[in-house]
């Protein structure tokens, strides 16, 4: 029998080699750390699917609770699939909430989208075929972009700000469809009783950089997909990793338990119900569901490659 030390070394070598392979397998961006704004985190990477013709584009927005994460977190597999399908991809950084309170991160994403559109001619991007994809906090930002009215400023002296912010489609991975306290308090009371106080604390005020809950609620509503959705909005694909009536994981693993609660399929169900009422196309995938698309990449490819 091999010693425990020998087995440990074998396991470490296996995972190290596979991690190294995964990192090497990710395509190198054609342009890296392109500045789209003034802050040091206002940078993006971009991969061109075909430099010889005009292509659609997907913008990836990373997650991390608005506190961490970066553009390098984009997964190699969906990135490669999109590029192979003839769709260019950009991945952006944005300011964390400790740098600037919400909705600064959202405004950064808007700025990145407008900047990319301003480069459409030189970068070979089809302005009319741009999708957005995000995970967790990045999904929340993505849905805000998708369901907000056009934020182009026709009167601005800055030509970039005149660019449209409307998109073709949006893909959300474990996204929070609302930031409003009423929904969250009920949600937490159902799955994590005793934690609702977080939404009545000074921490929430700091997230939005305000002095009272009324102001916090106003900003939260202004960035929430559930409050923004209207009949003229683009289609969405949402995915979550638990069934609606699934049993929560043990609280003995606080990190896993919290992640399960704040990325719950109930967020997706609430938005899909609202979008169904408005007759706006919405796809919701979870383990036992049946959906038209098997993955968010399949959805993005279908929507952006339509003639």
Residue ranges of each PLM-predicted region?
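Short amphipathic alpha-helix adjacent to the substrate-entry channel of hydrolases
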Residues: 71-90
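Primarily recognizes the serine-hydrolase "nucleophile elbow" in alpha/beta-hydrolase
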Residues: 31, 114-190
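Short beta-strand element of the alpha/beta-hydrolase
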Residues: 54-65
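C-terminal catalytic histidine-bearing segment of alpha/beta-hydrolase fold enzymes
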Residues: 45, 236-246, 250-253, 259-307
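Mobile cap/lid helix-loop segments that gate and shape the active-site cleft of serine hydrolases
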Residues: 26, 182-228, 234, 263
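N-terminal cap/lid segment of alpha/beta-hydrolase-fold proteins
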Residues: 23-53, 230
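Bacterial Sec-dependent N-terminal signal peptides
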Residues: 1-26
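Alpha/beta-hydrolase active-site loop
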Residues: 100-121
């Amino acid at each position: 029998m091999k010693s425990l030390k020998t087995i440990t070394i074998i396991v470490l070598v296996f995972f190290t080699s596979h991690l190294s392979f995964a990192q090497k397998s990710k395509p190198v961006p054609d342009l890296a750390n392109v500045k789209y704004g003034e802050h040091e985190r206002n940078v993006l990477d971009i991969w061109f699917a075909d430099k010889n013709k005009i292509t659609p584009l997907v913008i990836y927005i990373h997650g991390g609770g608005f506190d961490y994460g970066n553009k390098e977190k984009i997964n190699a597999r969906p990135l490669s699939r999109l590029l192979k399908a003839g769709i260019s991809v950009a991945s952006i950084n944005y300011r964390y909430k400790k740098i600037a309170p919400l909705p600064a991160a959202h405004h950064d994403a808007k700025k990145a989208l407008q900047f990319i559109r301003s480069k459409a001619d030189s970068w070979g991007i089809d302005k009319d075929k741009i999708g957005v994809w995000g995970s967790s906090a990045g999904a929340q930002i993505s849905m805000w972009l998708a369901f907000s009215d056009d934020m182009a400023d026709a009167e601005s002296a800055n030509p970039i700000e005149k660019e449209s912010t409307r998109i073709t489609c949006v893909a959300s991975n474990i996204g929070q469809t609302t930031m409003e306290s009423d929904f969250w308090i009920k949600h937490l009371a159902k799955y994590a009783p005793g934690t609702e106080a977080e939404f009545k604390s000074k921490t929430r005020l700091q997230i939005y950089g305000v002095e009272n809950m009324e102001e916090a609620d106003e900003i939260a509503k202004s960035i929430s997909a559930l409050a923004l959705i209207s009949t003229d909005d683009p289609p969405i694909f949402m995915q979550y990793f638990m069934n609606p009536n699934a049993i929560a994981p043990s609280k003995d693993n606080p990190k896993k338990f919290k992640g399960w609660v704040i990325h719950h399929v109930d967020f997706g169900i609430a938005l899909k119900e609202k979008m169904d009422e408005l007759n706006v196309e919405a796809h919701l995938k979870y383990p036992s569901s049946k959906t038209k698309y098997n993955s968010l990449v399949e959805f993005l490819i279908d929507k952006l490659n339509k003639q």
